Amino acid sequence: MSLTTQETAAIIADYGVKEGDTGSPEVQVALLTSNINKLQGHFADHKKDHHSRRGLLRMVSQRRKLLDYLKGKNVERYQDLIKRLGLRR
């Protein structure tokens, strides 16, 4: 269910602040969002997979924390990120 190396590299290139940037909140949120979207398709077929559902909830929680951090540090970057990712906030 995880992302391939090429998908990860593409996300890092799109959302990174600089070359090779993997630690910025934008990159981390984009990677988590991509993983979450992949897992949602998995749960359409496997409704009783509660073990993976716990991992999904953990990823959603981590994304929420990173978004809250980014919103507190720089509101413009936060708003740009949620617009680019198409999140509901």
Curated annotation (Swiss-Prot):
RNA-binding keyword on record: yes
Positions in coiled-coil regions: none
Pfam families in the cross-refs: Ribosomal_S15
Example GO molecular function: rRNA binding
SUPFAM superfamilies: S15/NS1 RNA-binding domain
Family: Belongs to the universal ribosomal protein uS15 family.
Entry function: One of the primary rRNA binding proteins, it binds directly to 16S rRNA where it helps nucleate assembly of the platform of the 30S subunit by binding and bridging several RNA helices of the 16S rRNA. Forms an intersubunit bridge (bridge B4) with the 23S rRNA of the 50S subunit in the ribosome.
Full protein name: Small ribosomal subunit protein uS15
Native species: Pseudoalteromonas atlantica (strain T6c / ATCC BAA-1087)
